[in-house]
Curated annotation (Swiss-Prot):
PROSITE patterns: MPN (PS50249). Residues 12-179 form the MPN domain. The modification N-acetylalanine is found at residue 2. InterPro entries: BRCC36_C (IPR040749), JAMM/MPN+_dom (IPR000555), JAMM_MPN+_peptidase_M67A (IPR050242), MPN (IPR037518), MPN_BRCC36 (IPR033860). The gene is BRCC3. Gene3D superfamilies: Cytidine Deaminase, domain 2. It comes from Callithrix jacchus (White-tufted-ear marmoset). This is Lys-63-specific deubiquitinase BRCC36. The modification Phosphoserine is found at residue 258.
Length: 316
């Protein structure tokens, strides 16, 4: 017997400027995972599709299904600063969540829309786009606080074996508690077992979670929003702060000799130069290109305005 899974979210709409910031962040480092938080709103889409004809009973059934559609709209993202840089692990501190909630409240006042933290994203450099058991368990923890919370993963630095070209894959997921029959229905690879145990009436029960993929759609934008632009500009600053923190933490050790300190300083300088070449330089060039494009568009609009004014004066 098939088990019906009730999804808290049916779709995610990610605006293209927020997608651009996530992509730039994921491609900023090849050795460690990066992370951030998504700011947006959760809407109940109650619109029905009038392109098809249904009978009365079918229409009621379709209307009930449509009324249940919940869509997460992601308008911007917040790039988080990593206190612990590890190859296969990212962590979000309560202080960062609190700061993100404060930023969401500021954006809500600025836009007049109910903005809040609706999800998180992180990168998978050189590995599969599918979430690990740690990702699924972390997502389940966030959903205990908010059922509409979603997780995004960007798999980057993946090379296609046939074409020898790089690829970037992305997915959106949520966690659900695995049914007892999940293993027999889908096989052991379709769910992830958590190592967390909870005590119920003196007995320990292992919680199992499985991922469920959420359809994600990129919403095109002609321009980049102010908030996303600020996040993109903030990326080099955050990467530089992470390098400074790591260098100061090592440099403060008292048992290091002079040669080791000189070596650490050289590594620190090399990392900063690499960031300038890989992140700051392309970002600056992109901003200059956008500025030139906007100025060209402004000149075209001014010329069009003058032509329309001339036509208007000739009619008088």
């Amino acid at each position: 017997m098939a088990v019906q899974v009730v999804q808290a979210v049916q779709a995610v709409h990610l605006e293209s400027d927020a997608f651009l910031v996530c992509l730039n962040h994921a491609l900023s480092t090849e050795k460690e995972e990066v992370m951030g938080l998504c700011i947006g709103e959760l809407n109940d889409d109650t619109r029905s599709d009038s392109k098809f004809a249904y009978t009365g009973t079918e229409m009621r059934t379709v209307a009930e299904k449509v009324d249940a559609v919940r869509i997460v709209h992601i308008h911007s993202v917040i790039i988080l600063r990593r206190s612990d840089k590890r190859k296969d692990r990212v962590e979000i501190s309560p202080e960062q969540l609190s700061a993100a909630s404060t930023e969401a409240e500021r954006l809500a006042e600025l836009t007049g829309r109910p903005m809040r933290v609706v999800g998180w994203y992180h990168s998978h450099p050189h590995i599969t786009v599918w979430p690990s058991h740690v990702d699924v368990r972390t997502q389940a923890m966030y959903q205990m606080m908010d059922q509409g919370f979603v997780g995004l993963i960007f798999s980057c630095f993946i090379e296609d074996k046939n074409t020898k070209t790089g690829r970037v894959l992305y997915t959106c997921f949520q966690s659900i508690q695995a049914q007892k029959s999940s293993e027999s229905l889908h096989g052991p690879r379709d769910f992830w077992s958590s190592s967390k145990h909870i005590s119920i009436e003196g007995q320990k029960e292992e919680e199992r979670y499985e991922r469920i993929e959420i359809p994600i759609h990129i919403v095109p934008h002609v321009t980049i929003g102010k908030v996303c632009l600020e996040s993109a500009v903030e990326l080099p600053k955050i990467l530089c702060q992470e390098e400074q923190d790591a260098y100061r933490r090592i440099h403060s050790l008292t048992h290091l000799d002079s040669v080791t300190k000189i070596h650490n300083g050289s590594v620190f300088t090399k990392n900063l130069c690499s960031q300038m070449s890989a992140v700051s330089g392309p970002l600056l060039q992109w901003l200059e290109d956008r500025l030139e494009q906007n100025q060209q568009h402004l000149r075209e609009l001014q010329q069009e305005k003058e032509e329309l004014m001339q036509e208007l004066s000739s009619l008088e």
